Amino acid sequence: MKRTVIMMLDSFGVGAAGDAAKFGDVGSDTFGHIAKACAEGKADTGRKGPLALPNLARLGLAHAAMESTGAFAPGFADNVDLIGAYGHAQELSSGKDTPSGHWEMAGVPVLFEWGYFSEHQNSFPKELTDKILARAGLDGFLGNCHASGTTILEELGEEHMRSGKPIFYTSADSVFQIACHEGTFGLENLYRLCEIAREELEPYNIGRVIARPFDGTGPSDFARTGNRKDYSLEPPAKTVLDKLKAAGGEVVSVGKIADIYAYCGITKKVKANGLEALFDATLAEVKSAGENTIVFTNFVDFDSHYGHRRDVAGYAKGLEYFDARLPEMLALLDEDDLLILTADHGCDPTWQGTDHTREYVPVLAYGAGLKAGSLGRRNSFADIGQSIASYFKLEPMEYGESFI
């Protein structure tokens, strides 16, 4: 029986990519810097000691990172009984954003330039916001800037609740984000507003509109809820997900995968929030998955909760939780199944600012007859999509080189 499980550790980079200088990210290293902080006792909040990832290490994580950076991360060495094939991949796409990374690994790199709102204040054109407000029947909005999602709630959350004005903000990514209180503004109203924004943003070539619902009574307890929703553009070509679906296969999205691909190539969507629930849902879907199925999960917390918030200890604790549960996944796999663990970009929690970092991503592959050992440096994330196409005996993708 042929099944593929893709576990996307959102933002888990393994060292600055070859073109990191273009992005101001030379020296970034999500995995390496987390390991270093843990080894130095600087990440002991909620956990303690060196970073412990024995199962990821057996799958080749430390070796992939060593080949990327030239040295083993602190606390890791070459004394592991490897069971997986490992490599690291350079992104071909022009950006270091979520859609670019996901689409490329499914065989469709983003070779065009996204639109961006580069001004840190007064970020959005008045013509754009006027159209959105008019269609939504709103008399104003807050924000209009680059901001951290948690900080902007502390600064503007109360005013939003008083005025009913939505909070519009952006970042270094190609994104338009809208934060609204679930209780006072309403979740469905927020979703409708995002749909309007998605339509009006078409001429600007913005990759995503993101609904950022939150709850709470004031700055001290405002918190995002699990009802985030991404409104992405469709990939510019058929991904390997589309091809498997067209061939009669199943593609199961766990978490935000369906949103990232604008539902293209998806046959089933499973909602889950948080590392534990996402892992539970992934296991449940693998248990019930039949022949010619992809189960694809995005573990977004690594990015949204720890990377962007520059929470090194939280990131380390999350990785250790994920690692501790990996044996449950391995126990479910048949001999012919293919497991792939990877990332879509970096988000070094020790780096300046709050944005993503341009890094190599790990490519860890297990099963399907693959021999343990190095896959080397992959020239594109699309090698993953090409390998999946080869595995399922689908028509080859235009980009990528199979490692199967």
UniProtKB/Swiss-Prot annotation:
Protein name, as recorded: Phosphopentomutase
Organism phylogeny: Bacteria, Pseudomonadati, Pseudomonadota, Gammaproteobacteria, Alteromonadales
Chief site of localization: cytoplasm
Any single biological process term in GO: metabolic compound salvage
EC number: 5.4.2.7
Family: Belongs to the phosphopentomutase family.
Reported function: Isomerase that catalyzes the conversion of deoxy-ribose 1-phosphate (dRib-1-P) and ribose 1-phosphate (Rib-1-P) to deoxy-ribose 5-phosphate (dRib-5-P) and ribose 5-phosphate (Rib-5-P), respectively.
GO molecular function, one term: manganese ion binding
Binding-site list for Mn(2+) 2: 303, 308, 356
Enzyme class per UniProt: isomerase
Protein species of origin: Shewanella oneidensis (strain ATCC 700550 / JCM 31522 / CIP 106686 / LMG 19005 / NCIMB 14063 / MR-1)
Gene: deoB
